[in-house]
Structures are given as structure tokens and as C-alpha cells.
Amino acid sequence: MSGFGFAFRDHGLDRDEPMRSQPERLDAAWTKAKGMVLDDKGNSCVYSNEDAFHPAARISLARPANATLLGFRDHQAYFAMPANALSFAPSETLGIRMAAGLWPDWQTAVFAQAKALLHWQAQSKFCGRCGGLSDLRSAGYSASCAVCGLVVYPQTHPAVI
């Protein structure tokens, strides 16, 4: 068996929720992490030979403020970030449908998680209650309004149709 199966059934990563509020641990994890970079259309900016993940050091030596911790797999940290944060232009992108046919299940699940989170972050820049500017917290898993204090969280469970 090739290791490939139905995409999105593998949960992908241990999301390690307690670590998201510990910047020093996030910074330490970044040094050996891998990052998934998505363009403004939600496509993955592949690293090389259709590899899903960039070495974090190629993206930035220090953890970028907009790097979202996706979780861990086999003690390896995985982060997501938008392509506009990069200092280089990605040469190739890959959509989620194409990735589902090329990548192992867990990588496709991580792609779906990254795409959903970065989309939510882009849509949550302003408070839904008062319109004030919201700041991302918890390594990208919550947004807090600077004006009224409303805290919102993404819905990260998969949809089944």
C-alpha cells in the first residue's frame, strides 16, 4: 500500500493548544520547524519538487509575528503563514484539490487546516461587535478586539457534506 488514501481523513497534527500562549516555546520550536506558506488565493507555495513545507529558517530566522502554529507531528513543529510575509517570491503554487492527489493524507489535512485558519484570520481583522481592530492571539487561534475586548475563535472542525 502506498500510504495514500482518502484525503482529509487523517487529523494531521497534535495541535498542542497549551503551547500557543507561550511565546518562548513557540520561538524555540520555530528554529527547527517547517512552514506551510499560502498565497492570497489559499494555494500552497510549494518548496521544491512539490514539497508542502518550507524549512522555517528559509522563511525567517526569527519566528514571524503572523506565523500560526498548526501543531506537531513526530516532535516536528509545523507553522502556517501568508505569502505576503515572505522576503522572496514563491515560484510555484498548488491548490488543495491537486495536493489531495499528490501528498499523503496527513499533509493534505494540514493544508486544509492552514487554509481555513489563514482565511479566518484574514476575515477577522475587525471586530464583529464594534468594528474595532482585532489583534491575533494564541499563535493565530484567537482574535481580540482592542476596543471592546471581544475574543473570537475560529471553527476548525471539518465540514462533512
Label every model-predicted segment.
Residues 1-104:
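N-terminal alpha-helical interaction blocks
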Residues 112-160:
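Cys/His-rich short segments
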Residues 105-109:
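Acidic/polar active-site rim loop that often engages polyanionic ligands
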